[in-house]
Every structure is written in C-alpha cells, then in structure tokens.
C-alpha cells in the first residue's frame, strides 16, 4: 500500500511518483519527438516495456498522434519480437534499455530505437545483468532525447486503442487494427468502462497485471489518465 498523501494525483511506481501534469507533459514531448521521427496517424509504435510509468507516457503519446501503440510481450524470443516489428511496419521501438542488448539482430533496418532507463523498482524485482543497463549503441536514450522536444501542439485527431497481439500459440501472433472511434463512441465507451472498472475522481487503482495484456492495458490507460492515483 502506498504511503503517498491522499492529495497526490498521479502515478506511483516503487518509490517514484509522477503527477498527472508531469505525465501529460512528458507524453506530449514524446509525441512531438515521434512526430519528428515521421510517426503519423494510423502508424504503429511498438513498446517493449515492463509495467512502468514510461509505458503509459509512450501509450498516451502514441494515441495523441492517432497512431497505434503496440505493446510487445517482453517474454517473447527475439524472432517473435522481430516478427511483430515487421508485421506492424513500425518505424519506432520504445524499450527498456536492458532488454535491447540481445535484440541487435532482431530489429529491422530503419527502425529507430528509444531506450528507456530501467527504473530501480524493476531492478529490485527482476534479475537483470547490471552490464546491460546502459542504452546500447544502436539506440537513443529516451531521457536525453525527451529534453530536445517541446510539447506537441499538432491537431487533435481520433485516438485508436492500443493494438494487442495474440500470444501466437497456434501460429504467428496476430494483431487487428480497429478504426479509431468517433467522439460519440469514445464518450459512450468511457462511460461504460468507468462503470465497469469503478473509476471515479480521486480513486486509487493498482495494476498487478502486465500492460502487454488487453484487460490490464485498457484498465491502466484509463486509470492513469483519470483523476486517480495509480500504484
């Protein structure tokens, strides 16, 4: 249970806290950077991240551009990751830095790789080679890159949901691009999900499930963007 004061509205991960305003600012800066990398409405941005504040920031940034965030199961083998990167046609991969060191040959040519520093709570939880914490030479450090971009000020466009690939147990993983909902559909869906998830202003949400799965992803995206504490 977090000991963060009840007045705090934002995301808590381990000992780190990030307010909603900070998350929104970082997401807008990521969106600006992605736009400069050529990401456009309807494109895919792949994310190879454990549960982390950066995951939600990347997801919100991608949605801001009207693009599809594609979470990749980080348990996948390099050839499975390679397949999804090729199948989506993505031009950008955002990943925890330590995961990238074994993927040099799995990342297609032309894909820009952004390395997210692996946070302390993840280092404490998982067995991670400390020699792999630095961003590899074929990737860009996301934190340094983030500081180069002003918040995105482009047009407001329909925002699609993240595209979740299947596990591929009966063949290759499969993903389906659903058209972005209309404003009316979005409003109706948000009312329904708020009721189902029990989200309301000031609520506290905890997310133990992996964000590469559809239900935790849907819940986490909404809890993180609502007036709630996300732990």
Features from the language model and the residues they span:
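Solvent-exposed alpha-helix faces
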Residues: 28-32, 89, 98, 171
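Conserved pre-ATP/AMP-binding loop-to-beta segment of ANL
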Residues: 51, 133-165, 171-172, 197-204
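Conserved AMP-binding/adenylation subdomain of ANL enzymes
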Residues: 183-208, 212-231
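A short helix-loop-beta submotif of the ANL/AMP-binding
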Residues: 44, 50-70, 74-78, 87-92, ...
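Adenylate-forming
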Residues: 1, 23, 27, 34, ...
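Conserved AMP-binding/adenylate-forming core of the ANL superfamily
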Residues: 7-52, 56, 60, 77-82
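Structural core segment of the AMP-binding/adenylate-forming
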Residues: 36-37, 64-145, 155-156
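Conserved AMP-binding A3 loop
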Residues: 19-21, 161-187
């Amino acid at each position: 249970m977090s000991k963060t004061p009840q007045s705090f509205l934002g995301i808590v991960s381990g000992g780190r806290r990030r307010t909603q305003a900070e998350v929104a600012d970082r997401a807008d800066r990521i969106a600006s950077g992605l736009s400069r990398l050529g990401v456009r409405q309807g494109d895919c941005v792949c994310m190879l991240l454990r549960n982390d504040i950066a995951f939600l920031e990347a997801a919100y940034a991608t949605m801001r551009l009207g693009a599809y965030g594609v979470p990749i199961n980080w348990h996948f083998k390099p050839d499975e990751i390679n397949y999804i990167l090729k199948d989506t046609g993505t031009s950008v991969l955002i990943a925890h830095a330590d995961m990238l060191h074994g993927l040099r040959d799995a990342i297609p040519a032309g894909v820009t790789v952004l390395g997210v520093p692996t946070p302390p709570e993840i280092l404490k939880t998982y067995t991670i080679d400390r020699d792999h914490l630095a961003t590899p030479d074929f990737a860009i450090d996301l934190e340094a890159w983030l500081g180069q971009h002003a918040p995105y000020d482009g047009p407001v466009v329909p925002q699609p949901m993240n595209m979740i690939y299947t596990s591929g147990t009966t063949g290759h993983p499969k993903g389906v691009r659903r058209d972005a909902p209309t404003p009316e559909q979005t409003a109706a869906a948000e009312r329904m999900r708020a009721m189902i998830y029990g989200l309301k202003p000031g609520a506290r949400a905890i997310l133990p499930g992996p964000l590469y799965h559809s239900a935790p992803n849907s819940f986490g995206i909404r809890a993180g963007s609502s007036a709630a504490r996300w732990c």
